[in-house]
Structure formats: C-alpha cells, structure tokens
Amino acid sequence: MTTAKRPLALLILDGWGYRENTHNNAIFHANTPVLDRLNAQYPHSLISGSGLDVGLPDGQMGNSEVGHINLGSGRVVYQELTRISKAIADHEFEQNPALCDAVDSAIKAGGAVHIMGLLSAGGVHSHEEHIEAMCRMAVARGATKVYLHAFLDGRDTPPRSAKTSLSHFDDLFTTLGHGRIASIIGRYFAMDRDNRWDRVSQAYDLITQGKSKFQYDNAVTALEAAYERNENDEFVSSSAITDADGQVATLQDGDALIFMNFRADRARQITRSFINPDFDGFERAVVPKMHFVTLTEYAGDIKAPIAYPSENLVNTLGEVLQKQGRTQLRISETEKYAHVTFFFNGGKEEPFEGEDRILINSPKVATYDLQPEMSSAELTDKLVAAIESTKYDVIICNYPNGDMVGHTGNFDAAVKACEAVDACIGRVVDALAKVGGECIITADHGNAEQMTDETTGQAHTAHTSELVPFVFVGRNATIDEGGKLSDVAPTILTLIGEAIPAEMTGKPLIHIKE
C-alpha cells in the first residue's frame, strides 16, 4: 500500500499582477473573498516576473513562456537577446570560440568576413548592437575585408526607419578603418519562412553573386531610391553597394559568413540555402565553400557552428523530483498546458518519471471574454480529486483566466475571470487542508491589473511589468521580500525537505518557524 502524500501545490494565476493604481484594475475591482482572507491570515509578499529578473531586457514585461521557464528551473534563464547583450557588455562576446574561429579562418585563407542579419533596433529577431559588436570584433582580430549584408526591418520597427541604422554603420566602418555595407534587401525576401523560395533566392544571389535589381555606391542612397519606388524597409529590392572602384563584394571560397539573427524561425530557410548539400529550394548558381556560423541554434538539422547554443537546463524542479523518487502532477487548460509541462521542464517535451499530466480543454469560444470562467470549474474538480487521492508530493497548476481574458481588453469580463479563479482557489485550499497539504499561490506575470492604457485611453491588452503575488498557505512561516520567479523552485524543494541542486541559483523565500 502506498503511503498517503501531503501534497504541496503551486497555483500559478496567469496574468495576475499587483498594481497600486486601482483605476481599471480588474483584480482590485473583483470580489475575491478567498484571496483576501488568505492574504490576511498567511504570510505573503510580492515577487518580480519581468525584466532582468527573468532574463529579459531591463524593463521588458514578462511573458508566460519565460515565466514558467524561470519558475521551473530555479534560476534566471537569460533569453537570447539579453544573453548576447550581456556577453557583449562583459567582453565575453569578443572571445566567443565559434565567432573567433570564423574570423580567423577567413583571415588565414586571405578571405573576407561577411556578416548578415536583420539590421534593426527592434530586438525581436536581432539587434543592431550585436551586429556592431561583430563588426568591431572582426576588425580587432585583424580582418581587413569585412562586408555587411543588411536585411532591412520595417515590421518590428517603423516602416521607414532604416536610414538611421545604415548611416550609423557607414560611420562605424569609417571609424574602424575597414569594412563597408555590401548589400541591402528587405526582410520580406531574406527572412521568408513560408517556403517562398523565389524570395529567398534573391537574397542568396545578392550575397553570392552580387546579382541585384539595383546597384548603388552608397547604402543610404540605395534606401532613398527604394523609398522613391514606394518600397518600405521590409520590401526593399535587392541592392548591391559598390566600392570606390565600382566593385561588388560577393561571398567566395575561403570566406566566413556569420548570421547575426538570434531568433530561429525566419533564419532557417536562408541558412539551409547556404549550407545544405542537397538543398533543392531553388537552383544555386554558385555554392561557396565557406565557414558559416549561426548566432544561435536555428534547428536540429542545421549543421553549422553555433556561437550561442541553446542552454541545456539540468536539475529543473521536475528533474530533481524524479531523482528523489517524488511524484508530481501538472494540470491546466489547453491554453497553458504547454507552460506547466514543456516550459516548466526547461524545454523538455517528455514527462519525467513519476510525473502525471492532466489536460482540461479550454472552451471553444471566439474570445474568452465570452466565457471568462473558462474551464476553471472542471479544472478544479480534477485538481481537488488529485489532492484527495494523496498520490502526489508536488502539484503544479495554472489558472489561465487572468491572462487570457485580460488579453481581450474587456474589463467586466476580466473582473468575472478573477472572481471565478478566486472561488476555485477556495476549493483547492479546503481540499489541501483536509489532507494536511500546503500551497504557494503566485503568478507568472501581470495583465488583468491594467485593462486600460492610461495614455491613450484604449484597451490595454498586453502584459505588464508589475510585481506578482506570492502567498504561502501552510505552516507558520516568514517570507523574504525582494524575490523573483526563479526563487520558487528552491522554495518548493526546501518545503518538502529536499536539497537544492547547485544549478539552481534562486533562494528559498519561505522559512518555517520551528
């Protein structure tokens, strides 16, 4: 006969932040007697779920994917943009082995260093600060032939904003004494992801042959001509930029080509056209034998050196529980099921041994303001049954309502969503009390606490950077202030009497009074 468990439940209230301003604050205006009572009776604080505290740029609002990765891994997991920017600031970037090898191989072969990527300050697929650091590093290591192939943005930036970036890089190369912009083309062509190979081929031919619709002696001139043709940045036609002698710079055998996009989805196709031996998306007139490097990992089947490989998160909470022979349950609705499983487990799809999963279908409605309670009652039925079974040591549950209804911008519906979740929490807490269990109530990021944009007066449908609640319903305890999401996993391990692995850099926030 199995021993009855006294479960510890982690209840993640998605999109549930704390905001001092009560105006258009659905969480404040909701009738939440259960949470009000728990906050009055039990220790609680606020923790951070945004910005640098979760591995995002300073001030950047949190999101569900990042939030659950931090919650489950017990460490701040730097997202690619932040990770690379931090490496540049710490002067680690210039020593990156994959990048150094590429530059050095080109220099040794008497070749050129070609740098391509989305020249943008948008920070979604790339960042021009990363491209600048690469140009500086190449010249610092002795490269005299450095060529930038600029893909222009206009989607994650204003439609006609590339002039500032192009002018900056012209000035940069003048300052460095080496290098120049060799070509420009809109991301519509270079960064297609829908197998429209006729678009990608134009970028490939531009870089490998200098084959272009237009040719200019200056990148800004080329851009201005594109605007005259009524082409915004995203759609700029292939334009080769010549040097003082009227020559174009093309990718040759022995050269290096470094792709500076950090987001994978729109980087895969053009990468495959450069490196796949059996590529058949379009006919390649030339296939240079060069040293190709990707900034991050684009896909498992793309065989090229990677400057910043994906971090393999070991000893996440789920893995530690498995190693210690503990049982665990992950439960949520469809909308957040991946978050309490795949993302909480650090990007691992398969369940750990001893990990059960329950998926509750989210309601089939056009938008969730039409059913703000979503499937919370059914979810709670299953959760209460799991608690009463005394089968699990740790239960991870996500209530999606605050986030999914918050995204609709419907204030009244968001209030109802919060009230539905509050009622569910009451049932969960009662069930835990009957079996001697405990729970932590927190959130992954804010949303429903701000339903109107104070500046424009329009609906605020995005996440926020507000702090999120952290409540411990259990033994007599104190809670440290100033916590963040990555402190939650170490806290759980401490509460169930397990050691915190070295990989977890978060700190336990709850201290039981003996």
UniProtKB/Swiss-Prot annotation:
SUPFAM superfamilies listed in its UniProt record: 2,3-Bisphosphoglycerate-independent phosphoglycerate mutase, substrate-binding domain, Alkaline phosphatase-like
Please give a single GO biological process term from the UniProt record: glucose catabolic process
Q: Does the keyword Cell cycle apply?
A: no
Which keywords accompany this UniProt record? Glycolysis, Isomerase, Manganese, Metal-binding
Question: Where does the chain bind substrate?
Answer: 125, 155-156, 187, 193, 263-266, 336
Q: Which cysteines bridge via disulfide bonds?
A: none
Q: Which cofactor does it need?
A: Mn(2+)
Any idea of its EC number? 5.4.2.12
Instruction: Give the binding site residues for Mn(2+) 2.
Output: 14, 64, 444-445
* Known pathway: Carbohydrate degradation; glycolysis; pyruvate from D-glyceraldehyde 3-phosphate: step 3/5
Q: Which domain of life is it from?
A: Bacteria
Give the cofactor note: Binds 2 manganese ions per subunit.
List the active-site residues: 64
Question: Molecular function (GO) terms listed?
Answer: manganese ion binding; phosphoglycerate mutase activity
Q: What does this protein do?
A: Catalyzes the interconversion of 2-phosphoglycerate and 3-phosphoglycerate.
User: What does the annotation say about its assembly with partners?
Assistant: Monomer.
UniProt-recorded name of the protein:
2,3-bisphosphoglycerate-independent phosphoglycerate mutase
